Amino acid sequence: MEPLKVATVWLGGCAGCHMSFLDLDEFLIDLAGMIELVYSPVIDVKEYPHNVDVCLIEGAICNEDNLEILHKIRARTKVIVSFGDCAVTGNVPAIRDQLGAGNVENVLQCAYIENAQNNPSVPKADGIVPQLLKRVMPVHEAVHVDYFLPGCPPPADRIKALMVQVLGGKTPKLEGTQLKFG
């Protein structure tokens, strides 16, 4: 049997979900025999590949680059898992939305001018610094998501439960203690 092509993506978040994924410990060795990791922050691949079987997406959609890669992922991936609370709800990155939709300039002003200790200036470099969206979004607001794995971060046992089911061609049944936020 050919290994499934798996990707992990890190959008607007803290990388805690990827750290929790690494907490799979010995199961990572088993997983390595079942999958081919084709795209991830932990490997050096620059372009998201075609024909990906499963992608775990960590983080909220905060900027134009996040939105662009997300549409590419959906077009090239069979199963998308919204991985962690930021991807599922927007969570911490969406705190800036409390200032109101469209207040991106106020957020940048506060972060880079008012609270700067050295060289106060808003970073602007076309093609280098992506344009922030007017509002932070969870993944499912931009593309269809097949499965949701909440948690901040989801613990390794929940990640394993989901991966075993998805890789086995089954629909994950996350319920009870397997389905909780925070």
Question: Where are the language model's segments positioned?
Answer:
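Iron-sulfur-associated redox domains of electron-transfer enzymes in respiratory
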Residues: 1-182
